[in-house]
Amino acid sequence: MAMTVHCDIVSAEGEIFSGLVEMVVAHGNLGDLGIAPGHAPLITNLKPGPITLTKQGGAQEVFYISGGFLEVQPNMVKVLADTVQRATDLDEAQAQEALKAAENALNLKGADFDYSAAAARLAEAAAQLRTVQQMRKGK
């Protein structure tokens, strides 16, 4: 039997996952982080993108978070997400449309253009698409 660590994924709306996992992969500020049982303690920011859980037995479950924090202790991993969705609940067509709209907004800058807001919308839409693609790859 593989070693496991307890993982909780929560947001302001509530807990979306709580259980034992063999591995957690999340998108941090400096790239992807792989967290296995016994990992050194760590707290880090998370960027928008997928979080992949490898459950007992090897089954994978993918979530999308819009950002947040990751806390790692030797026997516990906690994801505190701004917002979180199961990847299966994401609408790929809607994410592609949001990506196009954000790209258009960046190209059609007006006098009252908010570059940081447009860039954030673009990053979030791209992260949602990346999550859907990662979920498909895992199946």
Curated annotation (Swiss-Prot):
UniProt function note: Produces ATP from ADP in the presence of a proton gradient across the membrane.
Keyword Cell inner membrane: yes
Record-linked HAMAP family: ATP_synth_epsil_bac
Source organism of the structure: Pseudomonas putida (strain ATCC 700007 / DSM 6899 / JCM 31910 / BCRC 17059 / LMG 24140 / F1)
Name assigned to this protein: ATP synthase epsilon chain
Subunit structure: F-type ATPases have 2 components, CF(1) - the catalytic core - and CF(0) - the membrane proton channel. CF(1) has five subunits: alpha(3), beta(3), gamma(1), delta(1), epsilon(1). CF(0) has three main subunits: a, b and c.
Keywords from the UniProt entry: ATP synthesis, Cell inner membrane, Cell membrane, CF(1), Hydrogen ion transport, Ion transport, Membrane, Transport
The organism's taxonomic lineage, starting at the top: Bacteria, Pseudomonadati, Pseudomonadota, Gammaproteobacteria, Pseudomonadales
Gene Ontology molecular function, alphabetical: ATP binding; proton-transporting ATP synthase activity, rotational mechanism
One GO term describing the cellular component: plasma membrane
Membership in a protein family: Belongs to the ATPase epsilon chain family.
SUPFAM superfamilies: Epsilon subunit of F1F0-ATP synthase C-terminal domain, Epsilon subunit of F1F0-ATP synthase N-terminal domain
Family matches, as InterPro entries: ATP_F1_dsu/esu_C_sf (IPR036794), ATP_synth_F1_dsu/esu (IPR001469), ATP_synth_F1_dsu/esu_N (IPR020546), ATP_synth_F1_esu_C (IPR020547), ATPsynth_dsu/esu_N (IPR036771)
Record localization: Cell inner membrane
Membrane topology according to the record: Peripheral membrane protein
Lineage: superkingdom: Bacteria
